[in-house]
Amino acid sequence: MHRFDFRRLRRWELALAAFALSTPFLLPALAPVSSSLVSPAMAETVEKPDTSRIVSIGGAVTEIIYALGEENRLVGRDSTSTYPEAAAKLPNVGYMRQLAPEGIIAVNPAAIVAIEGSGPPEALSVLKQANIPFTTIGETYDEAGILAKIRAVGAFLGVPDKAEALVKSVEQDLDTALADSAARRESERKRVLFILSTQDGKIMASGTGTAASGIIELAGAVNAAGKFPGYKPLTDEAIVEAKPDVILMMDRGGAHGMSADQLFALPALSLTPAAKSKALVRMDGLHLLGFGPRTASAIRELNTAIYGKKTNASQ
């Protein structure tokens, strides 16, 4: 049985008190945490931590830990960590961008490993003040970023040999998937609009520098709204001008989200090429946007959903 560290608790209580005083003035944010709290390196920590009991923040990070066969160290995970199914049995410490320190402290972790962009900054500050080793894993939305992420998690866990074996397997799979996407001629590439949400009829879409933009490009398509960074609401005029051939969304399951008929009934979308062919693709969010070990599978699935069949070069 692991005893709770009461010396750590006292440090945490002081830090949490400061956090509680600041929270009334916090606003939820879609943006990543401040760069002062996230190292550009793929793994940043103050010292080599004890990783016998870890909380994993970020679906791809958790997935990598399982792929490395080191899941026995996990004592908690965030709400985006939905794969593999076994991860759902772990205590859920909340959404990666809206973490509450007390939920993480409650599972008594020896260390925390989190994907870049986790937050809010005030919560991360509380966790660091509680003297819990905190490691950030960097994020880029390309093949190199996926492989670096695996190596960084392997280094954090102290299993670099396992990480290199996984890198080799994932790299081969990615190279095959990317070769198929690259074989498609530029003139044949379809324009894809990723829609994050349609709240109150407002289309929140992906521009550049996002996981959505990255996976669209890796699948051999064009980001139809690639003229701005991050996510933002689009005007009706901007949607019509984007001329998407395909609409891409996360599959939220059940009755959540609009049906294809409801979506394409929205005035701006009704005027797009995608509406004429009812071209709507929904995929599991972590699989599509996680940029973890299964990304090659996501590339193939999205490529097939967009184009219907493989290119001649891959047949």
Predicted regions and their residues:
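Bacterial N-terminal signal peptides that target proteins for export
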Residues: 3-29, 35
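Boundary at the C-terminal end of the N-terminal hydrophobic targeting segment
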Residues: 29, 41-43
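Extracytoplasmic substrate-binding proteins
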Residues: 48-53, 122-200, 223-227, 278-315
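A short, structured surface patch at a secondary-structure boundary
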Residues: 53-107, 111-123
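Short secondary-structure boundary segments
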Residues: 58, 116-117, 139, 228-231, ...
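Short helices/loops that flank or line small-molecule/ion binding pockets
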Residues: 101-108, 130, 235-243
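A ligand-binding cleft/hinge motif common to bilobed small-molecule-binding domains
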Residues: 118-129, 246-264
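His/Asp/Glu-enriched short active-site or ligand-binding loop at hydrolase and phosphoryl-transfer sites
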Residues: 206-231, 251, 281
